[in-house]
Amino acid sequence: MIWLTLVFASLLSVAGQLCQKQATCFAAVNKRRKHIVLWLGLALACLGLAMVLWLLVLQNVPVGIAYPMLSLNFVWVTLAAVKLWHEPVSLRHWCGLAFIIGGIVILGSTV
């Protein structure tokens, strides 16, 4: 159950980052303020809930194991950026993500 909580904390943190990015995207001049307030409000909500879940995780998992698992955020954000905003990703970046995933698998297998 706690590992599921960790995954949700990670995904909410990513959602918060994506909402911040969306707040910087173009909006019509007459809707710009609402656009920014909406997306930054969602970002704060996601990041706040992620923090609460993260505190629950830290009560049950050593920080030396739990914190590296948040490196999955790099993977989720990259995949979302490619899908949502068609951002380019270099081969070097993909290789880096593969190393991150490998590291998480190694660390996760020690628990």
Curated annotation (Swiss-Prot):
Q: Which GO terms describe its molecular function?
A: carbohydrate derivative transmembrane transporter activity
Q: Which residues lie on this side of the membrane: Periplasmic?
A: 57-60, 109-111
Q: In which pathway does it act?
A: Bacterial outer membrane biogenesis; lipopolysaccharide biosynthesis
TM region(s), chain numbering: 36-56, 61-81, 88-108
* Location of the EamA domain: 40-109
**Its membrane topology, per UniProt?**
Multi-pass membrane protein
The protein's assembly and partners: Heterodimer of ArnE and ArnF.
PANTHER family listed in its UniProt record: 4-AMINO-4-DEOXY-L-ARABINOSE-PHOSPHOUNDECAPRENOL FLIPPASE SUBUNIT ARNE-RELATED, SMR FAMILY PROTON-DEPENDENT DRUG EFFLUX TRANSPORTER SUGE
Q: What is this protein called?
A: Probable 4-amino-4-deoxy-L-arabinose-phosphoundecaprenol flippase subunit ArnE
Q: Which organism is it from?
A: Escherichia coli O81 (strain ED1a)
